[in-house]
Amino acid sequence: MPERLAEMLLDLWTPLIILWITLPPCIYMAPMNQSQVLMSGSPLELNSLGEEQRILNRSKRGWVWNQMFVLEEFSGPEPILVGRLHTDLDPGSKKIKYILSGDGAGTIFQINDVTGDIHAIKRLDREEKAEYTLTAQAVDWETSKPLEPPSEFIIKVQDINDNAPEFLNGPYHATVPEMSILGTSVTNVTATDADDPVYGNSAKLVYSILEGQPYFSIEPETAIIKTALPNMDREAKEEYLVVIQAKDMGGHSGGLSGTTTLTVTLTDVNDNPPKFAQSLYHFSVPEDVVLGTAIGRVKANDQDIGENAQSSYDIIDGDGTALFEITSDAQAQDGIIRLRKPLDFETKKSYTLKVEAANVHIDPRFSGRGPFKDTATVKIVVEDADEPPVFSSPTYLLEVHENAALNSVIGQVTARDPDITSSPIRFSIDRHTDLERQFNINADDGKITLATPLDRELSVWHNITIIATEIRNHSQISRVPVAIKVLDVNDNAPEFASEYEAFLCENGKPGQVIQTVSAMDKDDPKNGHYFLYSLLPEMVNNPNFTIKKNEDNSLSILAKHNGFNRQKQEVYLLPIIISDSGNPPLSSTSTLTIRVCGCSNDGVVQSCNVEAYVLPIGLSMGALIAILACIILLLVIVVLFVTLRRHKNEPLIIKDDEDVRENIIRYDDEGGGEEDTEAFDIATLQNPDGINGFLPRKDIKPDLQFMPRQGLAPVPNGVDVDEFINVRLHEADNDPTAPPYDSIQIYGYEGRGSVAGSLSSLESTTSDSDQNFDYLSDWGPRFKRLGELYSVGESDKET
C-alpha cells in the first residue's frame, strides 16, 4: 500500500512540477495585455514580480491563463480548487463580477463571482469526459454590463490508473497441429485499458502466461502465443488450458491486471500407422454360401482420427485370391472379406489369405515413422453342406427326326451328387415346360424318350426343363434346360403357293404367257427346294395349253393357239403335277382354272362372264344381287311390322263377371271413376264465397275442442285458383289435429279385433291343416273367387 500511494502522488504532482519548471519562460514571453497567469489552479500574482516587470506587462484590459487541470476521481471533503479567473480591470474593489458558462458550468464547476475561484463540486471520470470547454466573462457588479469580451478556456481531466485491462473477446479457443515445431504461432489475444494511453503508463499493457507452461509462451507486448515445446503428441494429450494475464503500468508493481483463458486443441496429423489387433484371423464358411456373402471382418486400429485413420484393405497373397475379395468399410474402418466364386468342400477344405491394411492419406513429413501399413493372416475353413445335384452340362441340345418312333430315345442327361455321401439321383420333367407331354424321361438314368408324334411343321423347337432330385433329401434339386430340335423329313408334298386363277383373252396370241405360278413345300430340305412340274399323262398332248419351267423354280402356262371363244367354252381346267426333290420325292396335283375373257385391243380384260351378254347394258351380276338383297330385307321389315301390329297383349287384370264392385275402386280408370268424389269442382274453386273457412278432420277425433273460427271474408268472383289453394295450404299447415307426415306410423296392430284377422299377417305353416281358407267364403261375393282358389275340396282331401 505505501508503494501504491507513492505512485499515485507521483502521478498527481508530475504535471505540476513540469509546469512549475516551465513557468519563467512563459511569464517573460507573455503578451503585453496579460495581467495574470493561472497555472493548474494556482494563480501567480504580478505583485510578486519586480517593479520593472510590472511596468512592462501592464495593459488596460485582458485575460491571462493556460489550460486548467483537475484530477479525476478526487473525493476530498471540500470541493477541489481548479483555478482562478482574474482581469487587470479588477482593482480589488469587489465591483467586478465573474460569470462562468459552458460545459458543466454550475453543475460540475462552480465559480466564486467575487474572487473568480473555480471549484469542481463533483467527482470527475476521465473515461466519461476528458475535457470541458467553458467561457469566462467579467461584468460590472451593479450594472451587469460586460467589461470585456468573453473568453474560452479548457479544463482537462487528468488520468489516474483506475481501470484494469479487459479481454473483451475471451475466453479464446485455438488449434495447432500436433507435432508442430518449436515457436509455431498458435493465436494472439488482445486486452484493452480504458485509461489514457498518452499520459503515463496507465494504459501500457504487458502480457504473461500464468498457467500453461512449459507448453506455450507469449510475446509480452504483441500477445502472440507460440508453442514452447516441439512435437506435442495429440494421442498423449489433446487439449491444453492456458491462463493469460494483461497488466498495465508496463507490468510494474502496483499496476492493475486482467486475465483470460485460452483453450488450445491439438489437431491430428497422420503420424501413426495402422495396426491389426491380431496377427491371425479364423473364419469358417459353408460351401453352399451365396456369392457376395460377407465371410468375416478384419480391422487395423489407427490412433489417428478422421481421414488420417482411413485405411484400404487388400489381399496380397494366399491360395484363395481368386475365390475371395476384400472391401473397405469407410464407416467402420474395417475390411470385409466376401466370396467371389463358389466353394467346393470336396475339392478344397481350407484357404489361407494374407491381408494388408494401408493408410490412404500419408503425410510425407512423417514418412520416417512408416511404413504406414500392416499385414495379417486369415485362415478360412470350408464347411461341408448338402449340395444339390450337379448336371454334367449347364444346358443340353438334342436333335430328333420328326418321324422318330414313339418311345425312341432322343438323348440323355446326367447328374451327380457332389457330396461325399453321393446320394442317388432321380430325374423328372417339369411338366410346366411340357404341357402336351410329348417327352418322357427315365427316372434312373436320365434317358429322354418320345411320347407323342412330332411334326416339324408345327413346332421346330421344344424347350423342356429336367429336374434332378436327391433321393435321400428331396429338398436338394437342380434344374437344367434341354432344347430339342425337330429335324425335317420329306413328309409334305408341294402345292401351289396360292389359289391361282388365270385369264385368257379371246384375241390372245399363240405362245402368250397366260399365268406364272409358283409352288411351296412345308418341308425344309437342307439344300433348299427344287420343284418339277408336269402335266397329267392324258393331258400331255393338250391342244390348248402348254407349260414351261422357269429358272426361279416357277412355272409359266402358255396358250398354243388363238381364237378362243368364251361363248363356246368359258372355263378350262389344267391339272399340273408338282414334285419335290426329297428322298423319296413327294408330289401332288394342283388344278389351274383358266377363264376366257373379252379384252380390248391392247389386252386389257373387260368381261369374263357369259351372263354379260344377257344382262342389261351397264348392270352387272353383282349389282343385281345387291338390289335383290335390298328388296328381301325390305320385305322382312314389312312382315315384322305387320306382325307386331296384329299382336295384342293379354290384360294384366282378368275381369270377372261376378265381380261385385260395391266400394272397390278401380284404379285403371283415369281419375278414379265414379268413386273419385273428392275431386276439385272448378266451379266451386272459381266461386268460394260460401265455403266454410275451416273444415274439421273426419278421420280422427281431436284431443282439444276449439272454438269455431271466423269464416273467411268473401272474395270477389273470379278469384284465382292459385290463391284458393294457398289458403287451403295455410289451413292444413296450421291444423293442430293433423299428424306430421314425417312421423313414424305404427302398423303393428293392424287387423286386431277383426274376426277374419289381418290379410297382411303372413306366417309359416307346419302342416296342411294350417292352410284352411274356408272362412274366405263367408266374407261375401268379393272374396268368393279367392275362396275357391284356396279352399280344400273333397278331391283334395281324398288325395
Swiss-Prot record:
<dbReference type="GO" id="GO:0005886">
    <property type="term" value="C:plasma membrane"/>
</dbReference>
<feature type="glycosylation site" description="N-linked (GlcNAc...) asparagine">
    <location>
        <position position="188"/>
    </location>
</feature>
<dbReference type="GO" id="GO:0034332">
    <property type="term" value="P:adherens junction organization"/>
</dbReference>
<dbReference type="GO" id="GO:0007156">
    <property type="term" value="P:homophilic cell adhesion via plasma membrane adhesion molecules"/>
</dbReference>
<dbReference type="InterPro" id="IPR000233">
    <property type="entry name" value="Cadherin_Y-type_LIR"/>
</dbReference>
<keyword id="KW-0812">Transmembrane</keyword>
<dbReference type="GO" id="GO:0097060">
    <property type="term" value="C:synaptic membrane"/>
</dbReference>
<dbReference type="InterPro" id="IPR015919">
    <property type="entry name" value="Cadherin-like_sf"/>
</dbReference>
<dbReference type="GO" id="GO:0009409">
    <property type="term" value="P:response to cold"/>
</dbReference>
<keyword id="KW-1133">Transmembrane helix</keyword>
<dbReference type="GO" id="GO:0035249">
    <property type="term" value="P:synaptic transmission, glutamatergic"/>
</dbReference>
<dbReference type="GO" id="GO:0008013">
    <property type="term" value="F:beta-catenin binding"/>
</dbReference>
<feature type="glycosylation site" description="N-linked (GlcNAc...) asparagine">
    <location>
        <position position="463"/>
    </location>
</feature>
<dbReference type="GO" id="GO:0016342">
    <property type="term" value="C:catenin complex"/>
</dbReference>
<dbReference type="GO" id="GO:0005509">
    <property type="term" value="F:calcium ion binding"/>
</dbReference>
<dbReference type="GO" id="GO:0043083">
    <property type="term" value="C:synaptic cleft"/>
</dbReference>
<feature type="domain" description="Cadherin 3">
    <location>
        <begin position="277"/>
        <end position="391"/>
    </location>
</feature>
<feature type="topological domain" description="Extracellular">
    <location>
        <begin position="62"/>
        <end position="621"/>
    </location>
</feature>
<dbReference type="GO" id="GO:0007043">
    <property type="term" value="P:cell-cell junction assembly"/>
</dbReference>
<dbReference type="GO" id="GO:0098978">
    <property type="term" value="C:glutamatergic synapse"/>
</dbReference>
<keyword id="KW-0472">Membrane</keyword>
<feature type="domain" description="Cadherin 1">
    <location>
        <begin position="62"/>
        <end position="167"/>
    </location>
</feature>
<dbReference type="GO" id="GO:0044331">
    <property type="term" value="P:cell-cell adhesion mediated by cadherin"/>
</dbReference>
<feature type="glycosylation site" description="N-linked (GlcNAc...) asparagine">
    <location>
        <position position="33"/>
    </location>
</feature>
<dbReference type="Pfam" id="PF01049">
    <property type="entry name" value="CADH_Y-type_LIR"/>
</dbReference>
<keyword id="KW-0165">Cleavage on pair of basic residues</keyword>
<keyword id="KW-0732">Signal</keyword>
<dbReference type="GO" id="GO:0043679">
    <property type="term" value="C:axon terminus"/>
</dbReference>
<feature type="topological domain" description="Cytoplasmic">
    <location>
        <begin position="643"/>
        <end position="799"/>
    </location>
</feature>
<feature type="transmembrane region" description="Helical">
    <location>
        <begin position="622"/>
        <end position="642"/>
    </location>
</feature>
<feature type="signal peptide">
    <location>
        <begin position="1"/>
        <end position="29"/>
    </location>
</feature>
<dbReference type="Pfam" id="PF00028">
    <property type="entry name" value="Cadherin"/>
</dbReference>
<dbReference type="GO" id="GO:0000902">
    <property type="term" value="P:cell morphogenesis"/>
</dbReference>
<feature type="domain" description="Cadherin 5">
    <location>
        <begin position="495"/>
        <end position="616"/>
    </location>
</feature>
<keyword id="KW-0597">Phosphoprotein</keyword>
<dbReference type="GO" id="GO:0042802">
    <property type="term" value="F:identical protein binding"/>
</dbReference>
<dbReference type="GO" id="GO:0050807">
    <property type="term" value="P:regulation of synapse organization"/>
</dbReference>
<feature type="glycosylation site" description="N-linked (GlcNAc...) asparagine">
    <location>
        <position position="473"/>
    </location>
</feature>
<feature type="modified residue" description="Phosphoserine">
    <location>
        <position position="795"/>
    </location>
</feature>
<keyword id="KW-1003">Cell membrane</keyword>
<feature type="glycosylation site" description="N-linked (GlcNAc...) asparagine">
    <location>
        <position position="544"/>
    </location>
</feature>
<dbReference type="InterPro" id="IPR027397">
    <property type="entry name" value="Catenin-bd_sf"/>
</dbReference>
